[in-house]
Amino acid sequence: MVNLKAKPYNMSIEEKIGQLFVNMGASRDEEYLKSVLNNYHIGAVRYNPGKAEEVYEQNRILQENSKIPLLIAANTEAGGNGACTDGTYVGNEVKIAATQDPHYAYELGRISGIEASAIGCNW
């Protein structure tokens, strides 16, 4: 477990500044991912969509090699397919709202959250 309250006191100015940035990664290459972490000390990442196995592996590499747990973004407003290409498409928010049934909104959020979380997305 990382003691996040004490962590900022043990960080260089470069590491503190790096925490402000989100990397829009274009590669899932392990050496590239490690290089981004070591050189830029990013606090978050957003990636290009891919199959669930690829995205999970990318997120595993990132979290295992980051000094502080990363925020990993996913656009899941229409379903798990925003986290990975083989995720479940539920429906965009306008379509869900048009049903006027809160159950569908709940299911959209539930499915999106389960699928994003399963591949390591947490933001």
Where are these regions (language model features)?
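Enzymes and membrane/adaptor proteins characterized by extended Gly/Ser/Thr/Asp/Glu-rich
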Residues: A26, K34-W123
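Boundary/entry segment of secreted carbohydrate-active catalytic domains
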Residues: M1-D29
